[in-house]
Design a protein with these regions (language model features):
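Selective transmembrane helix interface/packing segments
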Residues: 1-239
Length: 239
């Protein structure tokens, strides 16, 4: 570090707290989700049938509950995880869709974002787990004692690897899709042949539509795996 005559630092990079594109997209997605679910919540408070956007959201909420939460966590424990599962599902889906807009803000293509989501899943899993969860890791029932000593570190390593697998899976799938689309768009300006341009344009359009499906699919996979981790943490001891 260098100082001037008054002992003020001259080569220190100032702390930058400006709002980046990713932060703006996350804030916008959070606001949209708040407004959407506020409408649905108000209809439930007054025992009314959901209207407008609520009609679209209600089947999706039921889908997450009946097809993801209950089968993987169980009816006894799923309710305390529902709010997080719904948040993760709709948040990832929405920011994936925003990444397909002309704004081009690919939030889930940023590994820091997927790391934060995976870290939250990991922390909730560990903090809400039962004693049987750790028993199956460090002292597995039905396994000879010498093997338990060998398998315990492997099981512990598996626990630590899970959030990284969750992080990389979401990041890589979204990033790869955007790279392919941007590469095809770039080829439109490389070729002078109108036939080639038309072919690449059609392929780009097809992949862009396919990305709409991928946006929902990746949200589903992340939520499903999260529910599986929660289910393993609260599983009852059957031995």
């Amino acid at each position: 570090m260098a100082f001037d005559g008054d002992h003020h630092p001259t080569n220190v990079k100032p702390l930058d707290l400006s709002i980046t594109k990713n932060v703006f997209s996350i804030m916008m997605a959070s606001l949209i989700l708040f407004l959407m679910f506020r409408s649905l919540g108000n209809s439930y408070k007054t025992n009314r049938v959901p209207k407008g956007i609520g009609k679209f959201l209600e089947p999706l909420v039921i889908f997450v509950r009946d097809e993801i939460a209950i089968p993987n966590i169980g009816k006894k424990h799923y309710e305390k995880y529902m709010s997080y599962l719904l948040t993760v599902f709709f948040f990832i889906w929405l920011i994936n869709l925003l990444g397909l807009t002309p704004l081009g803000i690919n939030v889930t293509g940023n590994i820091a974002v997927t790391f934060a989501l995976s870290l939250m899943t990991f922390l909730i899993t560990q903090l809400t787990s039962k004693k049987y969860y750790w028993k199956h890791i460090f002292w597995m029932p039905g396994v000879p004692a010498p093997m338990k000593v060998i398998l315990a570190p492997i099981e512990l390593l598996g626990v630590m690897i899970k959030p990284f697998a969750l992080m990389i899976r979401l990041y890589a799938n979204i990033k790869a899709g955007h790279i392919v689309i941007m590469s095809l768009i770039g080829l439109l300006f490389v070729f002078n042949n109108w036939f080639a341009r038309g072919a690449f344009f059609g392929l780009t359009l097809f992949l862009s539509v396919l990305e709409l499906l991928v946006a929902a699919l990746q949200a589903y996979i992340f939520t499903m795996l999260t529910a599986l981790y929660f289910g393993s943490a609260v599983e009852e001891d059957h031995h």
